[in-house]
């Protein structure tokens, strides 16, 4: 396989990942040592994320194929990309918390469900609770009226019992 064919294959791979992933976070990892990058990779892998370093020229071409040309502005300097196919919050949350601990890691941009997101949007997404947390909040809100009704009927029953005794 020629070098050109290998590069085309890599561009296709990146474009596919950009299109299919729920969430993609582009970071500048300059200043992190090997141990820190390994720790970040480990945390992302445990969450089901893929973290790779690609050449900027290939990533630019893939962004054009995936119709995400807004990404081209941030593809300067050392760039790594975290992808997740199912969870839109996981990569942003992990990278944001890691960036708070290690100031050298800088979030450049993101792609959330096919739309290019700014650094602020990625950080806002990272502050959201997980899907399970959001579902539990929704469930508690839905249960509140039923719980209050049950407590009210129990209070009425207790009051009647006291009056009858």
From Swiss-Prot:
Which SUPFAM superfamilies does the protein's record reference? Ribosomal protein L10-like
An example of a Gene Ontology cellular component annotation for this protein is: large ribosomal subunit
Q: Which InterPro entries match?
A: Ribosomal_uL10, Ribosomal_uL10-like_sf, Ribosomal_uL10_bac, Ribosomal_uL10_bac_type, Ribosomal_uL10_CS_bac
For this UniProt record, give its keywords in alphabetical order, as a comma-separated list.
Ribonucleoprotein, Ribosomal protein, RNA-binding, rRNA-binding
The job of this chain, per UniProt, is described as: Forms part of the ribosomal stalk, playing a central role in the interaction of the ribosome with GTP-bound translation factors.
Assembly and partners?
Answer: Part of the ribosomal stalk of the 50S ribosomal subunit. The N-terminus interacts with L11 and the large rRNA to form the base of the stalk. The C-terminus forms an elongated spine to which L12 dimers bind in a sequential fashion forming a multimeric L10(L12)X complex.
What NCBIfam families does the database record attribute to this sequence?
Answer: PRK00099.1-1
* Name of this chain's protein: Large ribosomal subunit protein uL10
Q: Which organism is it from?
A: Halalkalibacterium halodurans (strain ATCC BAA-125 / DSM 18197 / FERM 7344 / JCM 9153 / C-125) (Bacillus halodurans)
């Amino acid at each position: 396989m020629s070098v050109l064919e290998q590069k085309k294959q890599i561009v296709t791979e990146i474009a596919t990942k950009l299109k299919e992933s729920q969430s993609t976070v582009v970071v500048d990892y300059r200043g992190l040592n090997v141990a820190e990058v390994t720790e970040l990779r480990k945390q992302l892998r445990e969450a089901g994320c893929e973290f790779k370093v690609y050449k900027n020229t290939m990533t630019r071409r893939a962004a054009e194929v995936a119709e995400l040309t807004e990404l081209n502005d941030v593809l300067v300097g050392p760039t790594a990309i975290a992808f997740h196919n199912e969870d839109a919050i996981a990569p942003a949350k992990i990278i944001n918390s890691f960036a708070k601990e290690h100031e050298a890691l800088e979030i450049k941009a993101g792609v959330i469900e096919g739309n290019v997101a700014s650094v602020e949007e990625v950080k806002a997404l990272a502050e959201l609770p997980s899907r399970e947390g959001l579902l539990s909040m929704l469930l508690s809100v839905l249960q509140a009226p039923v719980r209050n009704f049950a407590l009210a009927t129990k209070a009425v029953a207790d009051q009647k019992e006291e009056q009858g005794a």
